[in-house]
Structures are given as C-alpha cells and as structure tokens.
C-alpha cells in the first residue's frame, strides 16, 4: 500500500508556506523529514520551514522543531536551540514541552544542568493530570532528584496516577506497600496493587502477585481481591464522572486542570479506604524502607576476571526500574537490523533476538538516573554514554562472538571516539542458558535479575583489548532481557566539528 503522505502536493505546500501559512510549513516539514535525514537537502529545508512557523509562535511547529533538534547532536547549537523552543512551548504550560525541557535540565544539554529546575518543570506537567508524568515526578521525589527525598509525597503521586488507571503506578505501589516505603507495610494492599498491575500486563506484576500469594493469609487474600476489584471499578467509572462534570478529552488549560483534579480527588475518596487515601495524613503509618525492591542498592564493582577486565555489580537496578525499562522498550522491539541504523550492518550478523533503542524522546527521569549510576560505576561522564538499548533473547536466541570496541574502519569519523567500556544489566534472567561468555578467557557469567557487568573493551593504554571477545550462549528456557550501552572516550553530545577540534 502506498504511503498516503506521498499524495500531498509538496509544491503547493511550499507556496502556502512561503505565504506565511504555518500549518502548511509544519506539514511540509514533516514530509521532508520523512524523506531525508540529517545532512540531506530535505532535512535542511524542513528545519528552515519549521523555524519560519516557530518564529510566528506556532506551537506545533515549535514543539516539532525542538523534538528534531534534540535528537541531532551533530548539528551546531542543536541542544541550545532545542531548549529555546521547548521553553517557548513550556511557557504555554504544554505538558510535553515541560517534560522535555525537564529532561534537558537533567542532562545539562542546551541549558545548565539543574535538577531543581527539572523537578519544577516535571511537576508543572504532572499537575495537569498526566499519569505517566505523575509517575516520573513520584520517582524523582522518591530518589531526591532536585529535592530532599520524600517517599511519602512520592506515594501520594503514585496514588494519583493509579486513580487514573496507571498500571505502572499500581506496580510501584505494590512494591511500596510490600516493603513499607513512604507508607505502612500492608500485604493485602500490596497484593491488590499487583493484581491491578497484572490486569494491564505490566512487567513482573504477575511474578510479584504470585510471591504475595505465598505469604498472605486467607483473610488478606480476600481483602486484596475485594480492594483490587473496587479500584478497577472506580477507574472504569472515572470517564463518566468527567462527562458529568462537563469535562471532555479536548479540554485544556488551568481551568480544565482544576476541574479534572477535583473530580479525580472526589471520585477516589469515595472508595473510603484510608490505606490508599491521596491525603498522607489519612494513610496512617509511614514506613521508612530505604532499599530493595523500591530503591536500587548497588555496591562497589566487584572483580569478575582480570583479562579482560570485567566487573560485576549486583542489585544495580531496583525491581521498579527493571520493570519500567521493560515496559518502555517492549512495544518498540524489532529485529536488530531495524532498530538502529548505526548498528544495523554490524549487529544483524551477530544477534538473532530483538532490540529497542531508548532515544532522547523516550528518556525520562528513570532512564537519566540509570545513566548517572552507570557513569559513576564506569568513572566516566554521563555525556559519554550511548543511548541505552534493550535486548530480548527468546528460545535459542544468541549473540555470536564479537568485540564491542570500534575497529579502525568503524572508528574513523565515529562521534564520541572509541567505545572504552561496555555496560550490560540483566532486566530478566533466563531459567537456563544465556550466559555471557568471554571466550578467550574461557569464562562465563550466569545472569541474575539486576546484575550489571562492566567490561573494558580497551587496555589501560587505550588500545583495543582482543581478550574482550565475548558472546551470549543460547537461551534454553525462559527469556533474557538486557539493558545495554557503551561509554565512549569523548562526549556524544557535541557537534562533530567541535569533537574533532577537541582531539
């Protein structure tokens, strides 16, 4: 079937754009971007057309332009220009722009790094009743990103997201009620939350529901089933409450947000269960659990082998972080040759599973916090880290023997220079098989959930280490999910010319 976009008359759109039609400029920009990437004449014209409309305060053009610039790191001043246009849209209280600008403050791209500014932007977006952004805000509050850690406030924001049907929030709350993080421990409420999360197929929710089933009493099980059903019924009836209040999906602005917030709070309070009240004063006991399964507890890297240099870090990711990364990447899984143009020619010959790359537009506070943790473990700046990717191995899938350092032909002109260190972390470990094997060292590492491996692709003098040849053995039973990245010798977020000058 032909792409219907090709039926548009490019020349007519150009004429309309030149006469100041902002909608035409945006449509033309979209079509040109589909036809050519960075470095093409189509890309250059698309940027020009979008800048024209953005300069006329066209919100869609400003946001699209910012999204494009934020992903083209080789373009001079791209980050600063992206931040400028995100800020222009954020001043209109646009939730996506607020979230993306918050991300730039987290990374220090285009603006000075400032976690407090990031938190402020993401909170403004979350207050507009967006469950995903409420989960992002809760995570930041829980981890003290831009503030002092506040597990109680984090629990309240997760509950607000749950009140709107977020399965991610339900999973997070299951963990919190299980261990007592910002709320009193309550096995029945925890099991009810995992039941709600499992209803939306949120990763690992069924596993945790099964764990709770083994330790709860018959009365707690009955309480959990009843509470889960009441929560589901309440969420299903929320749209009717919005309709009764005269709120439609198209409503926006501060007035609509106030109305929606009032309806959500009133409707949730009708459950009349203090254990899950949005008001922390009504929730009673406040647990002070500080670690697993809600908060990651990685220790110092432990030596695995010297040749090649491989270090292991148990408990690198929390249960929530692992499930979140799987949920984020699962809908985008594709064969290796499809998910990354840069790696396709190299990777498709070695890897038989599927993968997803977490590009800038997919990154959130969880991903950025993981990147920071990786940077600390590798003792290299976060700006040297490749965008994270996720690999999924099913039955018999393998990653054949390969090295991760860039060979001379691939290193020439590579943005960021040599890949000094490879990082992998098990999101899920198979029941059998799937070990990471260092062939020249005749050493294999069996995976376990949350285990991270750092292996050095280069010797201390910077030369490639041929001992780093490694592979993944076939998965025999279960699935293997890996979070993966590489840390380069130089920043990946500098224009190409500037990066070359630095060398």
Which residue ranges define each predicted feature?
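Fe(II)/2-oxoglutarate oxygenase catalytic core
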Residues: 195, 199, 206-453, 458-503
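Ankyrin-repeat and related helical/solenoid repeat scaffolds used for protein-protein interactions
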Residues: 148-152, 156-208
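Structural signature of tandem alpha-helical TPR/SEL1-like repeats
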Residues: 2-11, 38-49, 74-85, 112-121, ...
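N-terminal leader/linker segments that initiate helical-solenoid repeat arrays
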Residues: 1-30
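Hydrophobic face of amphipathic alpha-helices that form TPR/SEL1-like repeat modules
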Residues: 27-35, 64-71, 100-107, 111, ...
